[in-house]
Amino acid sequence: MSLLCLTGETFSCNPLLPYGSPNSMLKTLTEYLFSLPQYILPQHLLSAAMHRLARCENRLWKNAFINTITRIYGVDLSEAKEPNPEAYASFNAFFTRALKPEARPQSTDPDALLCPADGAISQIGDIAAGSLFQAKGKYFNATELLGGNTELAKPFENGKFATIYLSPRDYHRLHMPISGTLREMVHVPGQLFSVNAATANTVPNLFARNERVAAIFDTEAGPMALVLVGAIFVASIETVWHGEVTPPTVAQVKTWAYSGDAPSLAKGEEMGRFNMGSTIIVLFGENAVDWDAALQAGDRVMLGQKLGRLAKNMTFSS
């Protein structure tokens, strides 16, 4: 069975495949029913409204919002520097809360690549001729992910990638997997689909069609890209060197180049944050790093744990 979206895209969901169990067919159909309405929702308008609501400092509103999210998602405030939910000035202050230093110990392996965030691995693996695996036979392109810049994407053509999804319960600050010096930042306009498993399974080119901010660093492993992907209700994306990058959204790709006084960030240092949750994609070049072979899609990961190591016979192109 094919589904024709209002955008003109056709999706093959085949819920009646003879080899599928009733449960898997129902799951597939449910995922499409969740995803399709998002094509007609005013995604940016809803996200702008959330931007305002999340910063509202009315005590009754923000306390009710914080307590509801804490209860529904099981947020562990004992890890936070400020464990009292009512002490936060706004919902956004709660959502981007700092953790106690001991809450996320870093791997002590000097060659370790640290996990940049709390979350779940959506996918992890190799980039094949510039193509990254999304889910269920769907792929997206590194060049499109980085705003259509072929030169920017070239070093990652046959490299490694890891896609990590942050849920509403997670810590929403993002940290450096390895020390690096910022070379370029790119803000790519786009849509704002949800980025959970249902949309990853059903929306083509999801991560390369949503609004995103990509930061390119020079590291001892060669070029590294950290791509912060927006989603519906992700009210803003910010970095420590620029502040809030979005909103406002932009009509065209916008690029910042850094040279002489470029920011340098240490391994484990905060580099940015999501004001509401979404996804971070980490890219490295060919023969630069090796992921931990035990990690796979669906695994829960924590900030500071080892995602992989510098490759033993490291070679890379800049």
Question: Which residues does each predicted region cover?
Answer:
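Contiguous, well-folded functional domains in the mature portion of proteins
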Residues: 3, 11-318
